[in-house]
């Protein structure tokens, strides 16, 4: 940030403005609506995308699978990672680890609409030595056996785009 004189049609104001644009990253597909909202604020930002999804097993458990990523260098840049739901925190941590293959950010902001206590604790544990700030709309107390936040809002990707085939 730097102080800069901003001229408007009605006057001049001294304001703090970004020195450089952040990289706005999201987890495909559920994160796209929140990502688009972030781009309304940071309309000159670079974009990063990672596909991280739950691969379910017959025993009811699941692993987080990362199959695709596209990112500019994030070396010494501000990274803003957005995903509407922070349930277990696993996909956010794996996404972060995938992105830092393109450099280490100066600072990371993690933005979620709803998080679980378990997800927040998981981030704190697994991103212990990283510089990050959490921005959360709400923190709910419970995860179901299927790792959905209660009361939460359901599957954010399905709500935005319809059920998966």
PLM regions: where:
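PRPP-associated nucleotide enzymes
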Residues: 1-165
């Amino acid at each position: 940030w730097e102080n800069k004189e901003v001229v408007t049609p009605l006057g001049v104001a001294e304001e703090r403005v970004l020195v450089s644009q952040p990289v706005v990253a999201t987890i495909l597909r559920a994160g796209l609506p929140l990502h688009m909202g972030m781009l309304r604020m940071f309309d000159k930002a670079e974009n990063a995308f990672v596909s991280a999804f739950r691969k379910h097993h017959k025993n009811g458990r699941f692993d987080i699978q990362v199959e695709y990523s596209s990112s500019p260098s994030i070396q010494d840049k501000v990274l803003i990672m957005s995903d509407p739901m922070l349930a277990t925190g696993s996909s956010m941590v794996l996404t972060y680890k995938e992105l830092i293959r393109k450099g280490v950010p100066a600072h990371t902001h993690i933005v979620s609409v709803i998080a679980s206590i378990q997800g927040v604790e998981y981030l704190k544990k697994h991103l212990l030595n990283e510089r990050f700030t959490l921005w959360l709309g709400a923190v709910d107390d419970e995860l179901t056996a299927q790792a959905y936040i209660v009361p939460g809002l359901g599957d954010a990707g399905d709500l935005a785009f319809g059920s998966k085939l």
